[in-house]
Amino acid sequence: MSLDLYIKSRRPVRHRGTGVFVRDNGQTRELKTLAEVREHFPDADLTDVHVTDYEDDELFHANLTHNLTEMASHIPIAGTDGAVTLPRDFERDKPDFQPKPLSAYNLLWHPETNPLLKHETLHRKDEDGEEWDVEVTRIDAELVRQVMAVQHYTAHHREELERYNPDNGWGTYDQLLRATQDLLIALLDIPVSDYGDYLIYCST
């Protein structure tokens, strides 16, 4: 099980890649070149593998193993003192639900539990007419500030956080650090005037 964290665009985003994906240290990523494909699959027939340009709605994607949720829950979000978690859907009717201070878990895995962020429900329909709702988080200055705070704390508390590295080795502090760095870079590349064109989507 893992988290797929996306920045989705309301406009088409252009990419270049092979369409071949691998698991690397608990993350799923696309191989961008034929050389990378040959390195990972030296005995495979690559006749039908090509580097192509394509468009979708994905500006950014990070895949994180759920084994890192314990570590994420120990990363506080500076500037959110007094704010506590909202219940998830299955917790709404539980009388024993206990709100907790916000952590990176409530930013990366379940932003819908973060009351300081703005949320939106998108209504979707596939080619067969099936309808469904998608819960997303809007990108704004507060979200960017929280990601910056989480990345800063993660980068400066290696020794503390490495204690929560999973025993099975599937997922590491360095992986979480890299994901927060990459997410922050992607967010900072978006002009403030274009925030409305992008959304955060988390699939767990």
Predicted features along the sequence, with ranges:
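Acidic (Asp/Glu-rich) sequence patches and key acidic residues
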Residues: 1-204
